[in-house]
Amino acid sequence: MTTIDTASETKPFQAEVAELLNLMVHSVYSETDIFLRELISNASDALDKLRYESIANPALMADGGEPKIRIVPKKAPDTLTVIDNGIGMDRQELIDNLGTIAKSGTKSFLTKLTEAKDGAGLIGQFGVGFYAAFMVADSITVTSRRAGSAEAWTWSSSGGAGFEIAPASEEAAARIERGTEIVLHLKPDAAKYLEAYQIERIVSEYSDNIQFPIELVPEDGEPRQINSASALWQRSKSELTEEDYKQAYKQVAGAFDEPAMTLHYRAEGRQSYAVLLFAPSTKPFDLFEPERKGRVKLYVRRVFITADADLLPPYLRFLRGVIDSEDLPLNLSREMLQNNPQLAQIRKAVTGKVIGELDSLADKQPEQFAKIWDAFGPVIKEGLYEDYERREKLLSLARFTTTAGEKRSLAQYVEAMKENQTEIYYLVGDSLDRLKANPKLESAAARGIEVLLLTDAVDAFWTSGGLDFGGKPLKSLSQGEVNFDLIPKLDADKAEDKPDEAKADEATVIAVIKDALGDRVSDVKASQRLTASASCLVAGGFGPDRELEKMLARANKGAATKPVLEINLGHPLVAALADTKADKADATDLSFLLLEQAQILDGELPEDPAAFAGRLNRLVLRGVVAHG
């Protein structure tokens, strides 16, 4: 025969209370609003447990009404009460669940679920989150009746060394047919939590998608539901319409446009989680802020945890939406978020899924994908520099403006490559118009070779990684040597090279220029890039591309190395340097002019603009170019 203990008893906490409260207030939670989220989450867990146990024992649902959560503020005295009609707790469960930090109200229950391989959505961490209420309460009274039990019990504590457990008073027991009533005796500075608008604000922000109704019970009015009680991402795609997704996007993202892409799925297996992500159709104003923060919200069992969990890599920070885990604990601190292996697995899987969805969209709805790329391509390309594992997939997604006049994929580029062309050519700059006029394109254009024109700031970085696509390396037209000898010009009869005549003066001209310019350039070479212009500047064969060097120098992250000056031996200005009638002063002016006009064509100013203007005036007045 079992004897019911009806005596009141004071018990110590298994964990020292001051240390416990310090953990809650300082280590885990930074805002006091969180206490209500935790209590609502616990109530939701209790309702989940009741729903699960009632499958095997329907009588548990016989009394107590439909599952719901009630919040009751009272200003005389200052108490805030949270009530659920869930599974409830008996005496020992109150001691076990609320007497320690080490054991939560659902741990033993989870053991049963694990053995049954079912009900993962019932995971909870009741004991830990409950103590967050001491941030706003001087004392807490909990009265609970286990579903199907005749006894109700009251647990109470003022946050000292322990707690009291006793049979519930007749009045308290009468209020609770099943479930739990938590009464917070608020601190004076927490009186704001008695205001209806404050309660509604917190519920809207943190608990709107709890699947059970949350009712606010005012002192002078009728109870009313204050949450939507519908986690759309937990529903099947077959139940939802396009309009449902549009409305969800506006609620989740706080946006006014329509989504350009929607990704909704549920992952099952080692981890269970629901994903609902949207790509906006317009670019947010803070897309390129230095912090590069994402805007995907983390939920755990429909309870909002944070919007700052780095759930996706920075190059996907334009996405908006929700990831709702069934397995993560609710008490995730910032450090835990950064180091949690389960979260890392979710991030990896969801990132792969997003890239796959973008690839599918590019294939099946190219016009819709083009909208996303036009808005967020510069951000996605950051992944080419940062995400080595997915670089090839991201390269396949990328779209580039080219000299062919349209945005193309690298697959399209490779398909259109000229016979004997072995490299994918590109040019980086800060202006599309300036790139189109860049003299480094001349020889490629004469052969009909397509060139990628890259103008986003990130382009100078990701192209420095020595990438290839389909076995074809990417090659900058502003770095190192280029050789188009095996690719004929489009009109070979009109534009035949005369190498023997050109090479006759090559050594002389180069010697004159080197003597004049000294260490302003690292070398002077005859160009294979130029057909019409006199000169251009390129980077050497090793090290960063010229555009990246300039960017780093502007950011004071390194001095740009001396460029290589390439000259067109067939240009009259260059030929004038070999003219025996040209004196040293003219040769110096011509040499500097070749350097300075190349700088201007690259978007730079001459080192000494006044000296440049003087040289140009002298050459015009002397008619050197005309008679050269």
From Swiss-Prot:
It is found in: Cytoplasm. Keywords: ATP-binding, Chaperone, Cytoplasm, Nucleotide-binding, Stress response. The keyword Chaperone applies. Residues 551-628 are annotated as: C. The keyword Metal-binding does not apply. GO terms for cellular component: cytoplasm. GO terms for molecular function: ATP binding; ATP hydrolysis activity; ATP-dependent protein folding chaperone; unfolded protein binding. Gene3D superfamilies: 3.30.230.80, 3.40.50.11260, Heat shock protein 90, C-terminal domain, Histidine kinase-like ATPase, C-terminal domain. Residues 1-334 are annotated as: A. Its main location: cytoplasm. It comes from the Bacteria. Pfam families: HATPase_c_3, HSP90. Residues 335-550 are annotated as: B. InterPro entries: HATPase_C_sf, HSP90_C, Hsp90_fam, Hsp90_N, Ribosomal_Su5_D2-typ_SF. Belongs to the heat shock protein 90 family. Homodimer. NCBIfam families: PRK05218.1 (NF003555). PANTHER family: HEAT SHOCK PROTEIN 90 FAMILY MEMBER. Molecular chaperone. Has ATPase activity. This is Chaperone protein HtpG. It comes from Rhodopseudomonas palustris (strain HaA2).
